UniProtKB/Swiss-Prot annotation:
One of its GO terms (molecular function) is calcium ion binding. This is Otoconin-90. Keywords: Calcium, Metal-binding, Secreted. Belongs to the phospholipase A2 family. It comes from the Eukaryota. One of its GO terms (biological process) is otolith mineralization. Interacts with OTOL1. It comes from Cavia porcellus (Guinea pig). Major protein of the otoconia, a calcium carbonate structure in the saccule and utricle of the ear. Together with OTOL1, acts as a scaffold for otoconia biomineralization: sequesters calcium and forms interconnecting fibrils between otoconia that are incorporated into the calcium crystal structure. Together with OTOL1, modulates calcite crystal morphology and growth kinetics. It is unlikely that this protein has phospholipase A2 activity. One of its GO terms (cellular component) is extracellular region.
Length: 51
């Protein structure tokens, strides 16, 4: 009976890994965007410090 079911967990794990990858990359891109916004808001003060 154990040999009858392997295809189902495989589909489950592949779907889970896809979801994990999607959430991971979307989270990474969100972090990159927020970091870019932080640097944009800090940009003028950095330029003032350099001047």
């Amino acid at each position: 009976h154990a040999l009858d079911t392997p295809h189902f967990p495989q589909e489950l794990t592949s779907a889970l890994s896809k979801n994990i990858c999607i959430t991971f990359f979307s989270g990474m891109f969100k972090n990159v965007e927020s970091v870019a916004e932080i640097f944009d808001s800090l940009g003028p003060s950095f330029k003032q410090d350099q001047a």
